[in-house]
A protein has these predicted regions:
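Short alpha-helical hairpin
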Residues: 1-15
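Short, well-structured alpha-helical segments
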Residues: 27-34, 52, 91-102, 203
């Protein structure tokens, strides 16, 4: 099976698998990350086939929706790609991308690096910030039943991986614990450039949020 057909089959698989997913981690999120990754990849020396597969499968079984289990996603991707007779070397690379792409707290050190992961990670982080990022953040907060904001609960700026995974803090805290940190964690020049506008939009949003929260007119 040629690469184009594998991508086509992967799109079908992801759409079916995530048909009932939470709105911030559904097919439309995957689609945006896929497109962003392809755009960023134009300016990087990468294997585009690996980039596309990694982008499409990066949230195939997100640990947040599987009791914190980080092994289900890579395993599910391997089973699917093996069924399409994809080379094992590529499958292993995609597995490592899935295992290492997610932000897991400001104190967590990533264990694997590759140019392809850099591209996909930037794409995923871009979709976590800006207008879309704000919408996704509040959607997930509502899904988890979290408060919008509580001035008495301060953000934890140095969370460990386990603290991050277990956190049920108000949604506004997530801006400080993750979203506002991402601009400086972009891997590629293109990712950093694209992150600038989205980062500024979040800062403007927060400024307006606090004015309205305080009852200002």
């Amino acid at each position: 099976m040629n690469d184009e057909k594998v991508i086509e089959k992967t799109v079908e698989f992801v759409k079916e698998t995530l048909a009932n997913a939470e709105g911030g981690h559904d097919w439309f999120h995957i689609y945006r990350v896929w497109k962003l990754a392809r755009n960023v990849a134009q300016y990087e020396d990468v294997n585009l086939f690996v980039v596309e597969l990694g982008a499409l499968l990066h949230d195939i079984a997100d640990f947040k929706f599987h009791g914190g289990n980080e092994e289900i996603g890579p395993k599910k991707a391997r089973e699917f790609l093996t069924s399409l007779n994809v080379d094992n070397e590529i499958i292993e690379h995609v597995e490592k991308i899935i295992s290492n792409i997610s932000f897991k707290g400001s104190g967590h050190n990533q264990q694997f690096k590759s140019a392809e992961l850099d591209v996909i990670q930037d794409a995923d982080r871009l979709d976590a910030i800006g207008a879309i990022g704000i919408a996704r953040t509040f959607n997930y907060g509502g899904y988890k039943g979290r408060a919008i904001y509580n001035p008495e609960i301060k953000p934890n700026l140095n969370m460990t991986k386990e603290e991050y995974k277990k956190s049920d803090a108000p949604t506004i805290n997530h801006f400080y614990e993750k979203l506002l940190l991402l601009k400086e964690r972009m891997n590629t020049r293109t990712g950093r450039r694209m992150a600038e506008e989205r980062h500024k939009f979040m800062e403007q949003y927060l400024s307006q949020f606090y004015r309205e929260w305080g009852g200002e007119i």
